[in-house]
Amino acid sequence: MYCDIIMVQDKLEFRKYRFMKEEILHITDGDYFNNYFTKKIGGFAVPFREVIMDGEVVDIVYSDEFIKLRAKTLNVSENEYRSKMSVCEILSKNIYSTIYLWFGKDTFCQMNLLALLVYLEQIKYQGKLILNYIDDVTFEQIESNIDVKLGVYKKIYRDVLISKYKPKELGVLEARAVDLYFDYHSNNGMLATLIKNNANKSKSELLSLLIEASKDYGMSDLQAERLINFYLTIS
């Protein structure tokens, strides 16, 4: 009888452990780190796949209008864009008591993080949110276990990404990343000036120069190439 009780308790503890494990979700800043995370750290992790720093957005994240606009910006079909929305699908179930966010501090990651936080506000996520800032090159943690309080990010999203204005309140977001977002889109910004001043160089030389200068922006090679083509065309 005693053994039976112990076995029942063990089963209950095991089920409790499984339930607790299933309640935790990790959201990463892209496929590259996500693959590293699942192999080296472990746990259920999904990547947030977007390039919010490019193009425009609308008020409601992942609305039909948002998807249509973002698909056009990223030059993919709406179906292809939807196929990359694993975060949206998982979060819409709203079953996780704790979500860990793993993002970098560069502009690319910060604008994506902003959109994600707004989506969490939209679905009225009530669980615990913990942010870990990472180095996107070494994957080392820069800052850990930052408690994130929702409720302020919708306004920040509207101010920064729609009205193109830097508010005083930024929550957990990095002020420098927001500044560089505006610089990235400025015809007189650091990157635009760099391209214009080196227009006589070959495209490969200019690309290397731009990538080296834009580490804090977090730009991809493709983004850098688009930026070069844009400013060389209008210069």
Predicted region positions:
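A generic structural motif
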Residues: 47-52, 126-139, 221-225
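A conserved mid-domain beta-alpha-beta active-site/ligand-binding segment of alpha/beta enzyme cores
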Residues: 142-210
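Glycine-rich, highly charged phosphate/nucleotide-binding loops
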Residues: 75-91
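Long, charge-dense
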Residues: 110-168
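Charge-enriched amphipathic alpha-helical scaffolds
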Residues: 192-194, 212-235
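Acidic beta-strand-to-loop metal/phosphate-binding motif
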Residues: 27, 98-108
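A structured, charge-rich N-terminal accessory region that forms the first stable segment of a protein
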Residues: 2-80
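A general structural motif
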Residues: 21-23, 96-98, 126
